[in-house]
Amino acid sequence: MALWGGRFSQAADTRFKQFNDSLRIDYRLAEQDIVGSIAWSKALLSVGVITELEQQKLELALNELKLEVMEDPEQILLSDAEDIHSWVETQLIGKVGDLGKKLHTGRSRNDQVATDLKLWCRQQGHQLLRTLDQLLNQLVNVASEHQATVLPGYTHLQRAQPVTFAHWCLAYVEMIERDYSRLEDAINRLDTCPLGSGALAGTAYPMDREKLARNLGFQRATRNSLDSVSDRDHVMELMSIASISMLHLSRLAEDMIFYNSGESNFIELADTVTSGSSLMPQKKNPDALELIRGKCGRVYGAMAGMMMTVKALPLAYNKDMQEDKEGLFDALDSWSDCIEMAALCFEGIKINGERTLEAAKQGYANSTELADYLVAKGIPFREAHHIVGVAVVGAIEKGCALEELSLAELKAFSEVIEDDVYEILTIESCLAKRCALGGVAPEQVAYAVEQAGKRLQERDNAGVKVRPARLTDLDALEGMVAYWAGLGENLPRNRNELVRDIGSFAVAEHHGEVTGCASLYVYDSGLAEIRSLGVEAGWQSQGQGKAIVQHLVEKAREMAIKKVFVLTRVPEFFMKQDFIPTSRSLLPEKVLKDCDQCPRQHACDEVALEVNLQEQVIIKSSVA
């Protein structure tokens, strides 16, 4: 079903339709389109376009459709709809009839697709942050294990000075951390909601766009409707960040390909990331790394194509902008795959420490040490540089290393050279002298490894925050509540109940992933109950449950609620947060009635605890 047919007296040519349709690309925005539509239905309710009953029917049908899409997203491609917006609307009308035709009131596909795309970019951006962290952890772990593994450092692909394998890993840690920082900044910049901007001049309905933005999890609404539908900066910025990061990954891959070669033999990749030759049975090819290097150009091409597409577009939506998604999807998919594969290449990697040490001793990599030695003896550096160059030529002619020349032979190049020269020509001395911050001295490398690990841990800890639940959290909430209900720890809640009570829930979020939840159910008597508290497996004992409870108690205090209570089998947890035991008989009748849903109702072992918020206020006032 086309969304624009009334103006036309002839059907579109099938060739034009095929050329014009974008469903095969933008079907990936199905969940975002549905979530945006649910939020829009609430906005329409707020301005009286639809009734509360109509909004509930729309929301229920859209949630059903979302579940169907999650179970089988490929079903969308069987349709001949023009785009994902047409498909969602057609499916909705099929579920609720003409009511579905009301949903697009006051909305344009221009602000609709802009919102869908930002929702997708935000979600994908958070996932990419997690993937980058996985690679960083791998690099730091390998660095920690190989702080003492000497590696030749290169300039112009010629041996220059000795470093360590840890130092090499940490160089890429710095690069990938810059990628992480750029991506964080970009996610923050794109976190504005275009919905309600209409085609270009804004919606004609007086809805609260800031509230609409918050319902979709955005920081705020966009400030200019014309810019809102014209803006694709976030697409280009993400592709630019992906391109820079792919450059780093390509350099990483190139280094490792060289280190893995028979000529170097510094490392051996695991069989799991290599392949063989169809002709030469001895081959073990670093295909994973070569593909990372190869896909770099693919991401660059997508970015360049997008910039060329928008460089001369007039403001507001133009059909050219339909081309934004294919390149974006492919670029971010490729980037994500390459980050994951780079991390995988460090699993099972073997470093040939004997070979790297042997290589580091070759190529006169200690020449700079001899020059510094002469400087310490009072010879100007430029003159010392020349003397050492002549000495290297002499060693090459003799076929030996600098440290293998006799003292008499060394004195022939400079009389100031004494027996103590041999100590400074060792690999250990070469490394130890580079003791300034960022150098290869053992203490500096150890410090860098420690600091990198701390940064990762701090970021991991800081990534957890508690906030009010949103419609976009519904799937995570449903799964978590069902998990704990299945264990008999919480009461079961169906999806419709969760949708209805979404405003009572708070969630713990770790880098965009919901990891814990609970709700605050308010009774008429000025009491409130903490329900459905649960934390994802793997995230327990990390303070998330405590943070959620504190958030809900503070919310209750702001609402002037007198007491908050809980029924629990782990009273110790709540007592650490100022809850005290109370009698179940003092609880409202409705609480005990809700227990009818509990599978343990006839053998209840839950303890009732409460926190008196009024008493806390009195105590604080007295202390003050």
Swiss-Prot record:
EC number: 4.3.2.1, 2.3.1.-
GO biological process: arginine biosynthetic process via ornithine; L-arginine biosynthetic process
Region called Argininosuccinate lyase, residue ranges: 1-466
Protein name listed in UniProt: Bifunctional protein ArgH
Top-level taxonomy: Bacteria, Pseudomonadati, Pseudomonadota, Gammaproteobacteria, Vibrionales
Region feature Probable acetyltransferase, mapped onto this chain: 467-624
One annotated GO molecular function: argininosuccinate lyase activity
Species, as recorded: Aliivibrio fischeri (strain ATCC 700601 / ES114) (Vibrio fischeri)
A GO cellular component annotation in the UniProt record: cytosol
Keyword Cell inner membrane among UniProt keywords: no
